[in-house]
Amino acid sequence: MDFMEGLLTRRSVRKYDTSKKISKETIREIIKAAQYSPTAHNKQPWEFLVIDDREFLTNLRHIQRWTSFAKDADCVIIVCGDTEKSFSRSKEDESWSFIDVDCAIATQSLLLAAWSKGLGTCYCGAEPMQKVGACLKEHLNLPENIRPFAIVTMGYPAETPKQPEGRYKPEKIHWGCWENTDAPVETAAE
């Protein structure tokens, strides 16, 4: 699958084939791809926590209510950010930090890398839901400087996800100024 095909066909998967297991090597390759994501000032503040404990996956819904399907996933990857490594204006002003953006970019890379290997994923938020983040920190014994950003369920899809229609909307593209949604006319070079 080429990059554009993967980008345009990737979908959230919530039904997993419980008879198939993902190798640790495949998980490492997927996380390696995520670690090649760009970050502000190349700080690379992300950390990845892989959890395949059945009890945790089954009970995750008590921490983040929209993860009931995690019980059938092969694993979850908690994408975390290290606040001590994030680029920010100052150590005192975390409101101006790029940690969420850096973790979001890495999460998208992780989702696409998994899809390219025939795996399904579903991004489930942890940030900015403070209660979810606090519960994850407690249950997983995360250090004070580690913030859980995303919960990503992963496994082999039990079915082919339906492709939604109408995602591409040219009227959402503005050329040169907000009011202009007409694409510039391309002319052949003379």
Question: PLM features: what roles do these ranges have?
Answer:
Residues 1-190:
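Acidic, surface-exposed loops and disordered segments
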